């Protein structure tokens, strides 16, 4: 309720010449943190439901009827939480999928890198060597092994200073609000040039 009322007041004041919507939406996760809750990204829900958001905001600002904006924010929190849960479930299942796909030796640098790719889906060999506390050569070899297995893709085309991406993680994190995570995973696999899991 506080988030909805504060947001509608902020939008009514319109303190900046540009960016009020972005700043107003940025205040929500800060309010969540201040109240002791984990922050939740709800802008995706707003973008998908822009007309309802506008109507609810106008009712609060012009008629002082806050019920619509409170209901909208509640719906946004519930839907965004469910969307985040789906994203988390899809991401946390990836290391097992990758292990099956690559048949990596247990505790090898390649196997250990799988967990790091969830946390850092775009990385260099230097970053991986730091994270795993292995030599640059061991990290480079691990990334080559992961690339052959269809876990990562090298993005630069360079011979040196190469950047690797776990495209399935990137696709999941970049997917439109509400999209089935499996559709995003298929897109990531397509970028990797592989079929299925």
Language-model features: where?
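Phosphate/pyrophosphate-binding active-site loops
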Residues: 1-89
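Short alpha-helical segments that sit at the start of domains
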Residues: 83-114
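Short, cationic-aromatic polyanion-contact patches
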Residues: 106-107, 154-178
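Short acidic, hydrophobic short linear motifs in intrinsically disordered regions
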Residues: 114, 119-132
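Basic amphipathic alpha-helical segments that dock to polyanions
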Residues: 117, 139-149, 164
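Short, amphipathic alpha-helical interaction segments positioned at domain boundaries
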Residues: 168-197
């Amino acid at each position: 309720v506080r988030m909805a009322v504060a947001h509608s007041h902020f939008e009514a004041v319109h303190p900046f010449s540009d960016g009020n919507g972005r700043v107003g939406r940025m205040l929500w996760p800060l309010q969540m943190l201040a109240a002791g809750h984990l922050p939740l990204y709800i802008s995706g829900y707003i973008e998908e439901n822009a007309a309802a958001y506008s109507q609810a905001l106008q009712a609060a600002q012009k008629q002082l009827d806050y019920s619509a904006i409170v209901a909208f924010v509640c719906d946004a929190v519930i839907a965004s939480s469910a969307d985040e849960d789906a994203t988390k479930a899809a991401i946390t299942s990836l290391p097992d999928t990758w292990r099956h796909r690559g048949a990596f030796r247990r505790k090898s640098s390649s196997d250990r890198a799988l967990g790091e790719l969830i946390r850092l889906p775009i990385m260099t060999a230097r970053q991986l060597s730091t994270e795993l506390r292995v030599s640059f050569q061991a990290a480079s070899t691990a990334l080559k092994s992961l690339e052959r297995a269809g876990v990562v893709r090298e993005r630069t085309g360079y011979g040196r200073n190469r950047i690797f991406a776990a495209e399935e993680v990137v696709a999941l994190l970049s997917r439109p609000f509400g999209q089935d995570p499996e559709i995003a995973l298929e897109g990531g696999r397509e970028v990797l040039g592989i079929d299925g899991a």
